[in-house]
Curated annotation (Swiss-Prot):
Positions carrying Phosphoserine: S35
Main location: mitochondrion
Record-linked PANTHER family: NADH DEHYDROGENASE [UBIQUINONE] 1 ALPHA SUBCOMPLEX ASSEMBLY FACTOR 4 (PTHR13338:SF6), UPF0240 PROTEIN (PTHR13338)
Gene field: NDUFAF4
UniProt lineage: Eukaryota, Metazoa, Chordata, Craniata, Vertebrata
UniProt name for this protein: NADH dehydrogenase [ubiquinone] 1 alpha subcomplex assembly factor 4
GO molecular function, one term: calmodulin binding
Record keywords, A-Z: Calmodulin-binding, Lipoprotein, Membrane, Mitochondrion, Myristate, Phosphoprotein
Topological category with respect to the lipid bilayer: Lipid-anchor
Pfam (any one): UPF0240
Organism of provenance: Pongo abelii
Annotated function: May be involved in cell proliferation and survival of hormone-dependent tumor cells. Involved in the assembly of mitochondrial NADH:ubiquinone oxidoreductase complex (complex I).
Length: 175
């Protein structure tokens, strides 16, 4: 019973609504720039077959166009974006410690952070000279927090290659 009522409401004044939509003004093409018009006339005079190619409809492309679905959303107003940018507090930066590595294009590093090369070098320094490169000295040198340096030294290690000497055992001969 509900479908009958809804169908009646949906089909009410259907012809007038359809006629109104059909008789609406269609959007016109945006005007071309004067320099573009002269270039188009020049190209069409050089290649007259292009004009027919432009007017011809390609059924394959039209069928592909029917499958396209566009979902658009309004962009975020610029006022909200500017407000979000101003909320961030300015960060303090420091220069990288290793200037001999030219592969890295890092100009400045935020305080409290280190680059990968700095992390590898401080891990290697701590491994080679643990008495001089203590966690306190590393934290002071690279402007890091003490707990972060302790965690770094505890859980990370540099890559190490160990070569084991060959053993003098006789191989079992296959039969």
């Amino acid at each position: 019973m509900g479908a009958l009522v809804i169908r009646g409401i949906r089909n009410f004044n259907l012809e007038n609504r359809a006629e109104r939509e059909i008789s609406k003004m269609k959007p016109s093409v945006a005007p071309r720039h004067p320099s573009t018009n002269s270039l188009l006339r020049e190209q069409i005079s050089l290649y007259p077959e292009v004009k027919g190619e432009i007017a011809r409809k390609d059924n394959k492309l039209l069928s592909l166009l029917k499958d396209v679905y566009v979902d658009s959303r309004d962009p975020v107003p610029s006022l909200q974006v500017q407000a979000a940018e101003t909320c961030q507090e300015p960060k303090e930066f420091r220069l990288p410690k290793d200037h001999h590595l030219d592969m890295i294009n890092t100009k400045s590093i935020p305080k409290g952070k280190i680059s990968i090369t700095e992390a590898l070098s401080l891990l290697n320094n701590h491994k080679l000279f643990p008495e001089t490169w203590t966690a306190e000295k590393i934290a002071q040198e690279y402007q890091l927090e003490q707990k972060d340096v302790n965690s770094l030294l505890k859980y990370f290690a540099t890559f190490e290659v160990e070569i084991f000497p060959p053993e003098d055992t006789k191989a079992i001969q296959s039969k």
